Amino acid sequence: MAQVEYRGTGRRKNSVARVRLVPGEGNITVNGRDVRSYLPFESLILDINQAFDVTETKGNYDVLVNVQGGGFTGQAQAIRHGISRALLEADPEYRGSLKRAGLLTRDPRMKERKKPGLKKARRSPQFSKR
């Protein structure tokens, strides 16, 4: 018999995370590596587990993640978004608690583009009076 698996795609900044939830002991694997060796900060790991804390399902699922693009923070938040969507697929009754926690909303903030005549998006060249 085929194993039950729930999928979710999460995005944040330039990161895209494809998440698979499989019933298990709570192991999280990111790009073939354990989450603790992949992400350098404990705060990012807590960020990822937030969806499980809200739905009280910590330790019920193994998480398999393939994530690309962006930096550590963007990737961690993309994973969190993907886990939230996969949990919603697993049990639609989680929608209320996940929505209240703001975990189903895609954060729209992106890097502002560089403008011509400026050094960065808003940083202007140094002004010289003389």
From Swiss-Prot:
Nuclease among keywords: no
GO biological process per UniProt: translation
Any coiled-coil regions, as ranges: none
Entry's Gene Ontology cellular component terms: cytosolic small ribosomal subunit
UniProt keyword Ribosomal protein present: yes
Keywords (A to Z) from UniProt: Ribonucleoprotein, Ribosomal protein
Region (Disordered): 98-130
GO MF annotations in UniProt: RNA binding; structural constituent of ribosome
PANTHER family referenced in this protein's UniProt entry, alphabetically: RIBOSOMAL PROTEIN S9 (PTHR21569), SMALL RIBOSOMAL SUBUNIT PROTEIN US9M (PTHR21569:SF1)
Name of the protein: Small ribosomal subunit protein uS9
Recorded name of the encoding gene: rpsI
